């Protein structure tokens, strides 16, 4: 239950003075919530130094300044478009305040001749004179009026001013009880020189002095609070999971050894470690929640197959869920080849299965005849039931939302779940989004995989690239050619235009696959390429993950400067899956930005997906490394990633 001392902060926004029925919905829209607590979490984006200058001599153009002077004159405009001009004098010179379309009588009342005024605003220089247009603050020092020494500047929305938001935040801070017990360890507070929670809130929303170091410490303290709150949430989730009941699936070493004996290669040490982790988890009486992270081509499906065998040998069912029809059927093919010869009943279920085939699959799942099934979202639709689902494996898990995974889990009695990702995630990001999961990492590639040589080439040399691709086709190799868009009248790098050009130049059948095609058309194009009916496949990024064609040795990516590092790495991972030397050509259009050059240089330098993920995280932040379904999970309000990653590390200890 929530501590009653927190109740004032969870009042509606109209509990604050000055927030009425008109302002309340506008403020709610701005802060993304309905409570005073939501308002306090709406952080300023910067802070303006409004400390007073000693004289007009200290003014600098284009800076915000606060000055004090005597009203020397108020000059009416000489035409409708000219401003009213107010002259202030401080003994060292003049400052002209300009007001366009202002009420003259109001200005006369605000600026009586001979009286002192304090004004604050942006300084400009015009014809050798200092000017300030429409000052932000006009104060009468004789009444004790002074602008704030530092003004927080907030992100705003239509209908709100910065002054109104600032005033609301200051009022909200008064509801924070200074007597709250401190939840941060005293030694950490002292080591980091962090203020108390209330002092930190004051430090960002209502600082008394302009001190960048103090403001930064206040922000750090609040950011750490957010990291700590998330870590505590994960900790509670882990505890709750361990208190939940699940079917304990005993380890099946003999069955796994039989599967290993059929393989034409030895599993990597990383695969063995991950399998041991999963075997131990499955043998527990509470549900497994584990993520298997692996670089492209690291052999995640084999590890998933080991888990499926353990479930099947225990008398349970296992479901593999993939995000697309192509991946689901490819996964089925792999599982069928691995497990059917050993006597396991493997099937597939996607939205495209109809009629008697679908009915037979549904019946097999319901009566338990099917032990292992691969499929898409169709697996968790109404009408699909399992006799004894105890293991759920979600491939390319970043393509699914939490709700999708929970729907599939609901088909069983608290089944164990393994989520697999071919997109390496930096450690900090994994802690932020998947802190409730145990993590296993595949950081080795199976023996026999060839390194992929990556070359960065200007698109002015595209003819040379086409010639090289032609020579590869003559050697019975295959090539991917990735384009950034489907079609465009003025862009020859579109998939449609490039496919036509390659057909003409190479005199070869060229496949084409893109997101606008129907599912059956995409499947047919991919199948033709996989079986060698076409030797070159022009595609958009729909082939980014999961497509496995060992004969493909060349990946050409046009306009590569427009792709993210992680996406380029995934595309490159479509080649280098066989025994022949493979190449990735990153075609770019000059001039390159510094960030684009750094991305391409990173790809050229390394094939390590985890190193690439860290670089992408530093270059572009967390959003591009996660699918839309998950990016909200790392949407910190106070923490800035990757700059404050260290706070997450501290909170997780």
Model-identified regions with their sequence ranges:
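Extended, structured, electrostatic nucleic-acid-contact surfaces
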Residues: 1-17, 25-26
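Conserved pre-motif I regulatory segment
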Residues: 25-26, 31, 244-292
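Short boundary/loop segments of OB/S1/cold-shock single-stranded nucleic-acid-binding domains
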Residues: 45-65
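Structural detector for short beta-strands of small beta-barrel domains
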Residues: 61-82, 121
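Upstream accessory/linker segments immediately N-terminal to the RecA-like ATPase cores of bacterial MutS
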Residues: 77-262
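Inter-lobe coupling/hinge segments of SF2-like helicase ATPases
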Residues: 273, 286-601
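C-terminal accessory region of SF2 helicases/translocases
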Residues: 583, 591-653
């Amino acid at each position: 239950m929530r501590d009653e001392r927190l109740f004032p902060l969870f009042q509606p926004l109209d509990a604050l003075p000055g927030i009425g029925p008109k302002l309340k919905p506008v403020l709610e829209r701005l802060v993304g919530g309905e409570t005073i607590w939501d308002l306090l979490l709406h952080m300023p984006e910067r802070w303006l130094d409004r400390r007073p200058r000693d004289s007009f001599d200290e003014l600098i153009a284009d800076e915000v300044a606060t000055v004090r002077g005597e009203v020397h004159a108020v000059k009416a405009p000489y035409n409708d478009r000219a401003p009213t001009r107010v002259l202030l004098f401080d003994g060292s010179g003049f400052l002209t305040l300009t007001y366009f379309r202002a009420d003259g009588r109001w200005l006369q009342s605000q600026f009586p001749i001979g009286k002192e005024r304090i004004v604050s605003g942006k300084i400009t220089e015009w014809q050798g004179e200092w000017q300030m247009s429409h000052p932000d603050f006009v104060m009468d020092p004789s009444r004790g009026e002074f602008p704030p020494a530092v003004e927080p500047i907030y992100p705003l929305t239509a209908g709100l001013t910065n002054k109104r938001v600032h005033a609301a935040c200051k009022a909200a801070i008064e509801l924070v009880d200074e007597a709250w017990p401190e939840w941060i360890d005293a030694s950490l507070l002292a080591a980091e020189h962090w203020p108390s929670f209330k002092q930190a809130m004051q430090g960002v929303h209502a600082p008394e002095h302009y001190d960048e170091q103090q403001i930064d410490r206040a922000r750090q303290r609040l950011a750490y609070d957010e990291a700590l709150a998330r870590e505590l949430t994960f900790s509670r989730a882990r505890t709750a999971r361990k208190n939940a009941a699940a079917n304990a699936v005993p380890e099946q070493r003999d069955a796994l050894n039989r599967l290993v004996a059929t393989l034409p290669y030895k599993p990597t040490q990383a695969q063995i470690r991950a399998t041991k982790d999963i075997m131990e988890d499955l043998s527990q009486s509470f549900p497994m929640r584990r993520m298997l992270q692996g670089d492209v081509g690291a052999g995640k499906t084999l590890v998933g197959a080991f888990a499926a065998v353990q479930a099947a040998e225990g008398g349970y069912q296992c479901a593999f869920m993939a995000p697309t029809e192509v991946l689901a059927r490819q996964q089925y093919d792999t599982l069928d080849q691995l497990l059917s010869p050993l006597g396991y009943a493997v099937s597939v279920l996607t939205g495209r299965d109809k009629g008697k085939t679908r009915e037979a699959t549904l019946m097999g799942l319901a009566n338990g005849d099917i032990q292992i099934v691969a499929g898409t979202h169709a697996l968790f639709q109404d009408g699909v039931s399992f006799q004894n689902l105890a293991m759920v494996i979600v491939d390319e898990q970043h393509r699914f939302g939490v709700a999708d995974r929970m729907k599939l889990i609901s088909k069983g009695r608290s089944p164990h779940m393994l989520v697999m990702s071919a997109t390496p995630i930096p450690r900090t990001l994994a802690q932020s989004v998947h802190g409730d999961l145990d993590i296993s990492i595949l950081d080795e590639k199976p023996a026999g995989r060839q390194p992929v040589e990556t070359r960065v080439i200007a698109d002015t040399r595209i003819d040379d690239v086409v010639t090289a691709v032609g020579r590869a086709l003559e050697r019975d190799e295959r090539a991917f050619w990735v384009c950034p868009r489907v079609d465009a009248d003025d862009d020859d790098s579109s998939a449609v235009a490039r496919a036509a050009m390659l057909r003409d130049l190479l005199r070869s059948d060229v496949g084409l696959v893109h997101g606008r095609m129907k599912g059956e058309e995409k499947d047919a194009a991919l199948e033709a390429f996989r079986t060698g009916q076409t030797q070159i496949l022009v595609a958009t990024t729909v082939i980014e993950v999961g497509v496995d064609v060992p004969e493909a040795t060349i990946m050409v990516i046009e306009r590569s400067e427009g792709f993210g590092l992680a996406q380029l790495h995934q595309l490159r991972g479509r080649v280098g899956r066989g025994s022949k030397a493979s190449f990735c050509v990153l075609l770019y259009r000059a001039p390159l930005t510094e960030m684009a050059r750094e991305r391409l240089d990173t790809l050229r330098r390394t094939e390590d997906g985890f190193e690439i993920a860290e670089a992408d995280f530093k270059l572009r932040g967390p959003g591009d490394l996660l699918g839309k379904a998950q990016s909200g999970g790392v949407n910190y309000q106070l923490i800035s990633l990757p700059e404050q990653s260290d706070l997450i590390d501290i909170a997780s200890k």
